Regions:
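Mixed-charge (Asp/Glu-Lys/Arg
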Residues: 1-13, 19-136
Length: 136
């Protein structure tokens, strides 16, 4: 992934993968969420479940959530958002709805825009800010 080394954790604590920048030891925790699209009049939508417990479990190494949608036999551009930003959207902007220990995030895609619960998430499309490309 952009020159980072990827590792799968031995113990399931809610992370799908760890990515490491070898030259300085930078570690990122990543949770990948996938969904299939539902066609809409002006685009498509997708729904994702995130554990409330995991989202609220803020540690010194934040989780980066990557949301991907399978639409027309292709993967959408990834929505990449840090745990603290997603939690802030949930707690302060009414993004997502809580149900049975999970938060359900409903994304709607139109042209090059993405919204979640009416909030603009366009800034998170392919947001590799915390994953700069590494030249070897």
């Amino acid at each position: 992934m952009l020159g980072w080394n990827v590792a799968i954790p031995e113990v399931d604590i809610g992370d799908d993968i760890f990515v490491v920048q070898d030259d300085n030891g930078t570690l990122r925790r990543v949770q990948v969420k996938t969904s299939t699209s539902t066609l809409r009049k002006d685009g498509f939508s997708a729904q994702f479940n995130v554990s409330v417990k995991n989202l609220r479990n803020i540690s010194n190494i934040l989780v980066h959530y990557i949301f991907l949608v399978r639409h027309n036999d292709e993967w959408s551009n990834p929505i990449i958002i840090r745990q603290d930003y997603l939690l802030d959207h949930f707690e302060n902007n009414n993004v997502g709805s809580e149900s049975k220990g999970n938060i359900i995030f409903y994304f709607s895609y139109t042209n090059s825009n993405v919204e979640c619960s009416g909030q603009d998430f366009k800034t998170y499309i392919k947001n590799f800010t915390d994953f700069p490309k590494i030249k070897h």
